[in-house]
Amino acid sequence: MSNLGYSFVPVHPGEIIKEELQSRGISQKRLAEVVGVSYTMLNDILNGRRPVSTDFALLIEAATDINAELLVNMQTRYNMQIARKDKNVMAHLENLRKICATLL
């Protein structure tokens, strides 16, 4: 049921931001300075090692005009995909479904 018959693979929103910076010729260091975050934080986000928060998405929207809601929604879809690939999470959910099925 989690597949729903299609194979859409969510992209970390950092990839979109990274591509936009490259197309505009803006360095990560410069963007970090402009929006007021550390270079390390920005680099981690752009490389998918850190999630995009709502606050960060708003900063990026102000700086680049990339829609903040789009970035946050992308992050949510990405997080869901990661959770669905986690065998421990899925085993816990399956166990929970079995328990709840006996209660209802």
Put a short name on every predicted segment.
Residues 72-104:
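Short, charged recognition helix plus adjacent turn
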